[in-house]
From Swiss-Prot:
Subunit and partners: Forms oligomeric structures. Binds to AKR2A.
Record's subcellular location: Cytoplasm
Xref: Gene3D superfamilies: 2.60.40.790
Inducing factors: By heat and osmotic shock and salt stress.
GO biological process: cellular response to hypoxia; protein complex oligomerization; protein folding; response to heat; response to osmotic stress; response to salt stress
PANTHER family (alphabetical): HEAT-SHOCK PROTEIN 20 FAMILY MEMBER (PTHR11527)
Species, as recorded: Arabidopsis thaliana
Name of the protein in its database record: 17.6 kDa class I heat shock protein 1
Record's function text: Possesses chaperone activity.
Keyword Oxidoreductase belongs to the record: no
Family membership: Belongs to the small heat shock protein (HSP20) family.
Keyword set, alphabetical order: Cytoplasm, Stress response
Length: 155
């Protein structure tokens, strides 16, 4: 049996078996149901990475297909970073016939509580190739080297 799907469709059931874990033609009871595609869930669940460097907190959000005009970056209550956006449905023309609609429309919103050591007034955001980058600079702290003073023990 081949692990590569046949170009001739599912009519070729040579050596396929429902008990074979590698069979590609196992009956799927959910096959005909319409579930949201991964692209539509990508909007609703906007994936965000948050890393902390010595100088800043950096957030990167994957927002494929979104324009910067469709995205908002806000600071709420001087401590919460809010990234939100909304993609609108394309205008449908009367003479058009749609065969499949998989790209989603809708909105998303993500919130992150920021630590106290950040400069809220210097937050910067940029968007390139569907990736939003938000940089929140940290307050510079004067870290002094630990000074050790030897104490004489009397007695």
């Amino acid at each position: 049996m081949s692990l590569i799907p046949s170009f001739f469709g599912n009519n070729r059931r040579i050596n396929n078996n429902i008990f074979d874990p590698f069979s590609l033609d196992v009956w799927d009871p959910f096959k005909e149901l319409q579930f949201p595609s991964s692209s539509s869930s990508a909007i609703a669940n906007a994936r965000v990475d948050w890393k902390e460097t010595a100088e800043a907190h950096v957030f990167k959000a994957d927002l494929p297909g979104m324009k910067k005009e469709e995205v908002k970056v806000e600071i709420e209550d001087d401590s919460v970073l809010k990234i939100s956006g909304e993609r609108h449905v394309e205008k449908e023309e009367k003479q058009d016939t749609w065969h499949r609609v998989e790209r989603s429309s809708g909105g998303f919103s993500r919130k992150f509580r920021l630590p106290e050591n950040v400069k809220m007034d210097q937050v910067k955001a940029s968007m390139e190739n569907g990736v939003l980058t938000v940089t929140v600079p940290k307050v510079e702290t004067n870290k002094k080297k630990a000074q050790v003073k030897s104490i004489d023990i009397s007695g």
